[in-house]
Design a protein with these regions (language model features):
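Proteolytic maturation boundary segments
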Residues: 23-61, 241, 247-314, 318-319, ...
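Hydrophobic, small-residue-rich alpha-helical packing segments that form membrane-like cores
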Residues: 161, 168-237, 241-243, 248-256, ...
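A common structural junction motif
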Residues: 156-165, 258-266, 381-390, 635-642, ...
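Metal-associated gating/positioning segment near the N- to mid-region
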Residues: 86, 98-106
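M16 family metallopeptidases and their MPP-like homologs
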Residues: 60-62, 67-84, 90-92, 109-158, ...
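Gram-negative bacterial Sec-dependent N-terminal signal peptides
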Residues: 1-22
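Peptidyl-prolyl cis-trans isomerase
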Residues: 114, 164-165, 169-170, 452-456, ...
Length: 802
C-alpha cells in the first residue's frame, strides 16, 4: 500500500482503458477496426480466446511470441479484504501466504524447492498479491519443458483448491505476517488511513485494509481460514489467464487437464462495499502525524461510484476530462519551477476507488510554512481553468502527445511481453472490460481526440467540480489545534481572489545544429554477439546491437568518463545536487518546458545519471524520431542549461527528504552505515542537510562541464534499428562534436580500493520513530566487481539467500 494520492491521468494510455504495450498496424487496419466498433461495443483483441469450463471457471488464452519459449499464468480470485467480517480481517492476505505452505501435491516446505529445481524463483517468477476486491497469483514460466509446465499448473491448481491449511503451518506463518504488518506500517500509511476515513466515509474500505489487524493475524483459528477458503476459492469466482508462446489448443488442453475436475459451485455471496456518504457542505480537516514527510493540501470531491458498461461512448466520454487534467497538470508543473512558487509539486485528476467512490482531486506538497499559499495556488489554478478554459496551444501539445503515444503503442504491440499481457487481461476481466488492442483503442478514440476543442475540455472540468461539496484536507507533521478553522479561512479567502486567463508561452524552434559530420575510422564486427563497434573521427566509440524483441523501441546511452569517483573528494552528496541541476536545467537555449512544447508528439527525452565511473545521458526513442533523439542527446552533452529550475525543486524537497530519513529505519541505515563501513570517507558518506543545501550550480558546472565536452565517451545503441541506417545519423550528431580523449583516465588506487572498516564488529543504530520497526543487516567484505566471474558467482550466492 502506498500513501493516498489521487493522481491525474497524464499518459495517453489513460484515454484508452485497455492495456497498451503497443503494436504495428497500418492505416487501413485502424479504419477497419473503427467500422467494427460502430455498433458501440469495443472489439476484443482477436488473438484472445475466452471460454468457460463446465464448472464455471472463466479462462483466457492469448498466444504471444515474446519472450520466446515462455508463458505466463495469472489466477485471479474474485475475493479480497472487502469480503471479510470483523473477526477475520486479514485472512484474505494470510491465505495468500498459506497456499505456498502445504497443499495437495506439496507438503509444507516442498513447493519452493520444487519450483527452484525447475528454474522458478519465488518473488521473481512466482508471486501473489491481495487487494480489497481480489487475490491474484502470478507465475512467469521460463520453459516449455513438460516437467516445468506440469509443475506450474499443478501449483496453480493447488492454489485454487488444494491448500491444506494445517494448524501448525498457520501458527508458523503468524510471525511472518506480523513482520509484514510492521513493514507496511509507516507515517504515510497511517496518514492514508485517516484520509480514507474522511474521503470514503460510509464505505467499508477504511475498515478493511488487506493486511488486516494484529489480533486476527495472531489469533484467528484454523476454521476461519478453512471457511473463507472454501467459500470464496470456487471456480465461478476465478479467472485463469495464460499468455505466451503457445497455441490456443495447448492452452485449452492445459486448462481442461488441470482445472476441469474442480467441482461446480453455487456461489451466492455479495460483496458489500458500503455506501459513500457524500458531503452536504464544504468541510476542512487537519491531520497530524509527527513523522509525516511533508505537508500536503488537497481539495477533493467524492461521489458514489457508478458502474458504466464498457462501450465506445463511455470510453470516449472520459477523454475531454482526462485531457483537461493533463493540461492543468502541465500548468502546475511549470509553476513549480518558479522560485516564488509556494509548492514543491501539485497535480489534479480523477480516480475510481475500488468501485466505491469516484474522486476528483487537486493536491499539492509544500513546506509547512507555505501550506496556506500552496492551498490558495491550487484552488486558484483550478478555478482559472474552470472559468477561462484552455488555449489552442495547450491543446495542440496535449493532442500531439496523445497521438504519439497511441501510434507508438500500435507500433510496438507485436512485441508486447507475455507477462504484461497476462496481467492486463486479468485486470480487464476484474473490471468487466473488453480487452482491446492499441489499434482498436485508437480507432475508438481518434476522431474524438482529433476534433477535441478547448471548450469541451473546459466544460468537462467544470462539470467535474460542480454540484458537489469539496473536502479540503491538510496533512502535516505539525500540530495545529486550530487547523481545520485555518484551512477553511484560507480556502474561503482564496475563493474571493480574482483570477486572470492563462498566458501560454510562445513556441520556439530547436536551436541546436552541429558541425561537419564525422566519419567512421574503424569498424569491428562481433558476429556471434551481433554487435558492431565503431570509432568515429573525433574519438567517440560506438557499440551497436540491433534486437527484435521490442518492436520500434531504441535505447541510446552516452557514457562519459568521470562519474561519482571523479567528484571533488570532500563534496559529499554533490552527485545528488548534480542530478537535480542536469535533469531540471534543460539546455542553454531551451528550458525543459520549452523542450516539452518543441518535442510534443515525438518519442524523445534525455535523462542524466551516473555510475561510479561514468556520467550517463540516456534516452529511448523509435525509428521515426531517432535522429531527433540523437540531436537532443548531443545537445545535452555539449550545451547543458545549468538552470535554477531543478535546484528550486530540490531545495524545496530537501527538508522533507531528511525528515523522512530521520524517522524511518531505511533512512538510519543510509545516513549512518556508509560512514561506518568506509571510515567516514566523504566519497561514500551521505551528506548532511546543511551540506546538500549549500551547493550551488557553479559546483556542478565546475565538476561535469569539461568532462562532458572532452572526456572519453562510448555511445551504446540497442533496439529495433538497422546498423547501416543509424551510422549516418551518428556521424551527423555525436560524430560532429569536437575531438575527445581516446581512452578513459586511469583510476587512482585509493579510489579503486578505498580503506574500509574491519569486519569484525556489530553495532546498534537508532532512529526517532513511534513505529516499532527494526532492520537487521549483515555485511561481508568481498573483492570489487572488476573480476566478472567472481561477481557473477557472488550474485548467485546472493540469490541463494532468498
Amino acid at each position: 500500500m502506498k500513501a493516498f494520492t489521487i493522481t491525474s491521468i497524464l499518459a495517453a494510455a489513460c484515454l484508452f482503458p485497455s492495456y497498451s504495450p503497443a503494436g504495428a498496424a497500418a492505416e487501413n487496419k485502424i479504419q477497419a477496426a473503427s467500422m467494427q466498433t460502430a455498433a458501440g461495443i469495443p472489439k476484443q483483441d482477436p488473438q484472445l480466446i475466452k471460454g468457460k469450463l463446465a464448472n464455471g471457471l472463466t479462462y483466457f488464452i492469448r498466444p504471444n511470441a515474446e519472450p520466446k519459449g515462455r508463458f505466463s499464468i495469472r489466477l485471479r480470485v474474485n475475493t479480497g479484504s472487502l469480503n471479510e467480517t470483523d473477526d477475520i480481517q486479514g485472512v484474505s492476505h494470510f491465505l495468500e501466504h498459506m497456499v505456498f505452505n502445504g497443499s495437495t501435491h506439496f507438503k509444507r516446505g516442498e513447493m519452493i524447492p520444487a519450483m527452484q529445481k525447475e528454474g522458478l524463483g519465488l518473488g521473481g517468477d512466482a508471486n501473489a498479491y491481495t487487494a480489497f476486491d481480489e487475490t491474484v497469483y502470478m507465475m512467469d514460466v521460463p520453459s516449455m519443458k513438460e516437467s516445468t509446465v506440469d509443475l506450474a499448473f499443478t501449483i496453480m491448481r493447488d492454489f485454487a483448491d488444494g491448500a491444506l491449511l494445517e494448524e501448525s503451518a498457520i501458527d508458523a506463518e503468524r510471525g511472518i505476517i506480523t513482520s509484514e504488518y510492521k513493514v507496511r506500517d509507516s507515517a504515510g500509511y497511517r496518514v492514508m488511513k485517516e484520509v480514507f476515513s474522511i474521503m470514503l466515509d460510509g464505505t467499508r474500505i477504511p475498515d478493511r485494509y488487506p493486511i488486516g489487524t494484529l489480533e486476527v493475524i495472531r489469533t484467528a483459528p484454523r476454521e476461519k481460514f478453512i471457511n473463507y477458503y472454501r467459500t470464496h476459492y470456487v471456480p465461478s469466482q476465478m479467472q485463469l489467464v495464460i499468455a505466451g508462446d503457445i497455441t490456443p489448443e495447448q492452452g485449452k488442453a492445459w486448462v481442461e487437464k488441470y482445472f476441469g475436475s474442480m467441482k461446480k459451485d453455487n456461489y451466492s455471496f455479495q460483496t458489500d462495499r458500503g455506501t459513500l456518504k457524500t458531503a452536504t457542505e464544504t468541510t476542512a480537516h487537519w491531520i497530524t502525524n509527527k513523522e509525516a514527510t511533508s505537508t500536503e493540501a488537497s481539495i477533493n470531491i467524492a461521489r458514489p461510484y457508478v458502474n458504466k458498461p464498457d462501450t465506445v461512448a463511455n470510453r470516449n466520454k472520459d477523454i475531454p476530462l482526462n485531457v483537461a487534467y493533463a493540461m492543468l497538470n502541465r500548468r502546475l508543473e511549470k509553476m513549480a519551477k518558479n522560485a516564488d512558487c509556494p509548492f514543491i509539486s501539485a497535480e489534479g485528476g480523477r480516480a475510481d476507488i475500488v468501485e466505491a467512490a469516484e474522486v476528483d482531486s487537486i493536491q499539492t506538497q509544500a513546506d509547512y510554512k507555505n501550506w496556506k499559499a500552496a492551498l490558495a495556488a491550487i484552488e486558484q489554478e483550478l478555478r482559472r481553468a474552470i472559468e477561462f478554459g484552455f488555449n489552442k496551444e495547450e491543446l495542440a501539445e496535449a493532442r500531439s502527445n496523445i497521438t504519439a503515444a497511441a501510434e507508438n503503442a500500435i507500433k510496438s504491440w507485436a512485441t508486447a511481453k507475455s507477462e504484461d499481457l497476462a496481467s492486463a487481461i486479468a485486470q480487464s476481466a476484474a473490471r468487466d472490460k473488453v480487452f482491446t488492442t492499441p489499434q482498436e483503442d485508437w480507432a475508438i478514440s481518434r476522431e474524438v481526440v482529433e476534433n477535441l476543442t478547448p471548450e469541451q475540455c473546459q466544460a468537462a472540468l467544470k462539470e467535474a467540480w460542480t454540484g458537489a461539496f469539496p473536502r479540503v484536507i491538510v496533512t502535516s507533521n505539525k500540530e495545529n489545534s486550530q487547523g481545520s478553522a485555518e484551512i477553511m479561512k484560507a480556502y474561503r479567502e482564496s475563493q474571493t481572489a480574482k483570477v486572470q486567463p492563462y498566458q501560454a508561452d510562445g513556441r520556439k524552434d530547436f536551436s541546436y545544429k552541429f558541425g561537419d559530420p564525422g566519419k567512421v575510422t574503424a569498424r569491428t564486427e562481433t558476429t556471434d554477439l551481433g554487435v558492431t563497434q565503431l570509432t568515429l573521427s573525433n574519438g567517440v566509440r560506438v557499440n551497436l546491437k540491433p534486437t527484435e524483441f521490442d518492436k520500434d523501441s531504441i535505447n541510446i546511452t552516452f557514457a562519459v568518463d568521470g562519474g561519482e569517483l571523479s567528484r571533488p573528494e570532500k563534496a559529499s552528496g554533490l552527485e545528488l545536487f548534480a542530478n537535480a541541476v542536469m535533469n531540471g536545467g534543460g539546455l542553454k537555449d531551451h528550458s525543459n518546458d520549452e523542450l516539452a512544447a518543441i518535442m510534443a508528439g515525438k518519442k524523445v527525452g534525455v535523462g542524466f545519471s551516473m555510475t561510479d565511473r561514468f556520467f550517463l545521458l540516456s534516452g529511448n526513442t523509435n525509428r521515426e524520431d531517432l535522429e531527433t533523439q540523437l540531436q537532443l542527446q548531443t545537445a545535452y552533452l555539449m550545451h547543458p542549461g545549468y538552470r535554477q529550475d531543478g535546484v528550486t525543486l530540490l531545495r524545496r524537497a530537501i527538508p522533507m527528504i531528511y525528515n523522512k530519513m530521520d524517522h524511518e529505519v531505511q533512512g538510519a541505515m543510509k545516513k549512518q552505515v556508509p560512514a561506518i563501513l568506509y571510515r567516514n570517507n566523504p566519497r561514500f558518506t551521505f551528506p548532511t542537510q546543511e551540506q546538500l543545501t549549500s551547493y550551488q550550480i557553479k559546483d556542478v558546472r565546475d565538476w561535469v562541464d569539461a568532462p562532458l565536452k572532452n572526456n572519453y565517451m562510448e555511445v551504446t545503441v540497442t533496439g529495433d534499428f538497422r546498423t547501416e541506417d543509424i551510422i549516418p545519423l551518428l556521424e551527423r550528431t555525436v560524430g560532429a562534436v569536437p575531438k575527445r580523449a581516446e581512452a578513459p583516465a586511469t583510476l587512482d588506487e585509493t579510489l579503486r580500493h578505498p580503506a574500509m572498516a574491519d569486519f569484525n564488529f556489530s553495532k546498534d543504530l537508532t532512529y526517532d520513530s513511534s513505529i516499532d520497526k527494526t532492520m537487521v543487516c549483515l555485511f561481508w567484505k568481498t573483492p570489487g566487481g572488476e573480476n566478472k566471474k567472481l561477481a557473477r558467482r557472488l550474485n548467485m550466492l546472493k540469490a541463494g539467500f532468498y
